[in-house]
């Protein structure tokens, strides 16, 4: 850990700024600021070599630690008791998002990992879902940065567009809460959009969104199973299952269960949530520090187009399913 200290210190200090800005601009959020700051750092500053081990470690390990601590704010029992009724909307829209990202990702010649991350982020809970899936599929920093940037862009758009459309279509608080909870990616954006519509819509959307976020677990397990199956097909299955199962997903589940059964004092939960946000910001600074604007230009508009199509498919399917079920 000694050789990582300098880089970790840089990531920590730089992460404080995005977290501060995220409190003042919750629509954008600390994750966006952290990723941009990391990229700007890489572009404008010639980073010393002894900072690289710590920054690289932040981008990989702290990303996983942020997911573990996020588990404490997602108590499975509490969310499930109130949000199961929304699954008949959430599950089909999650499927639609994945299929749209995979199909159109192939059409626009996106790399396999990039289209998977865009689909995962659109389907479940934005940056947190991408952070959970990236280590499992062994995505690189460029793929993480491109997918997160795509998701963050549409999160910000949704905050402004969804309430306007809700009023134009005269949606009830229940309808808008269900729609925004199933069709907007990031939790902060869901909260911003839904509570701007009404308090009742905001409360409904939050429950739906948390229920949707819990799908991180089964979908990650599905990715693990797929990876194991492919390894088996290639004759590399000996000892692979142990290597494939990511320890941080196991600890995420443990954290959620501990929170559900009340073993974690309520007074501690806000601090654990803040720690998750800090680790995520530090991780994104580390990831951004290995990405350049040239890589974004080289990728072109394809990631945004795939993200846009997947987003439209999710929003549209959510509305159609509401008309069928309610």
Q: What positions do the PLM features span?
A:
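Structural signature of hydrophobic alpha-helical transmembrane segments
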Residues: 26-40, 82-95, 119-122, 148, ...
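Helix-coil boundary and interhelical linker segments in multi-pass alpha-helical membrane proteins
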Residues: 20-23, 76-85, 166-175, 195-204, ...
């Amino acid at each position: 850990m000694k050789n990582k200290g300098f880089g970790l210190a840089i990531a920590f200090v730089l992460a404080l700024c995005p977290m501060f800005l995220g409190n003042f601009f919750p629509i954008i959020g600390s994750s966006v600021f952290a990723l941009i700051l990391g990229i700007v750092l890489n572009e404008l500053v010639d980073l010393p070599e002894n900072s690289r081990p710590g920054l690289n470690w932040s981008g990989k390990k702290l990303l996983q630690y942020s997911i573990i601590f996020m588990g404490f704010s997602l108590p499975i029992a509490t969310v499930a008791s109130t949000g199961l009724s929304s699954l008949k909307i959430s599950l089909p829209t999650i499927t639609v998002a994945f299929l749209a990202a995979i199909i159109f990702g192939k059409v626009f010649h996106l790399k396999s990992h990039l289209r998977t991350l865009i689909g995962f982020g659109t389907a479940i809970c934005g940056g947190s879902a991408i952070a959970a899936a990236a280590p499992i599929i062994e995505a690189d920093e460029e793929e993480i940065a491109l997918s997160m940037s795509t998701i963050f862009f549409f999160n910000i758009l949704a905050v402004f567009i969804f309430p306007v459309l809700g009023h134009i279509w005269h949606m009830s608080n229940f309808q808008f809460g269900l729609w925004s909870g199933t069709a907007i990616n990031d939790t902060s954006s869901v909260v911003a959009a839904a509570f701007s519509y009404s308090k009742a819509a905001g409360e409904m959307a939050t429950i739906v969104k948390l229920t949707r976020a819990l799908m991180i677990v089964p979908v990650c397990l599905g990715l693990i199973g797929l990876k194991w199956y492919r390894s088996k097909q290639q004759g590399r299955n000996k000892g692979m299952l142990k290597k494939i199962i990511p320890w941080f997903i196991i600890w995420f589940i443990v954290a959620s269960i501990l929170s559900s059964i009340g073993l974690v004092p309520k007074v501690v939960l806000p601090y654990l949530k803040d720690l998750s946000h800090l680790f995520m910001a530090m991780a994104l600074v580390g990831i951004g520090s290995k990405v350049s604007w040239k890589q974004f230009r080289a990728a072109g508009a394809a990631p945004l187009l795939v993200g846009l199509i997947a987003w439209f498919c999710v929003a549209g399917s959510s509305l159609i399913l509401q008309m069928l079920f309610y």
